[in-house]
């Protein structure tokens, strides 16, 4: 897990693939927040289609590559959790802080990948 976390941290822009509510594949740039308690945490906004898509079908994949063309692809189930500790931790990222200002922002959501595995 530590090697995966290090790779995600070194390559901050990942791509999150979901199945949209229209049944079509969707792929969006995303950013890994951090690992806590063995979970890979990400965040999003509950007004976005990606949030609604993951609620409807939580099976997702995250893909990321390095400038040297090394890459990983992780499959897992997106699990949303009202976890204030994680929300506060996400605020350490200036991009997240700039978008949401505080961990108490009502549109701010965090999720982790349940049973992530490489594919």
Predicted regions, residues:
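Charged, amphipathic alpha-helical segments
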Residues: 1-2, 44-47, 95-96
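A short mixed-secondary-structure module that forms the rim of ligand-binding clefts
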Residues: 33-69
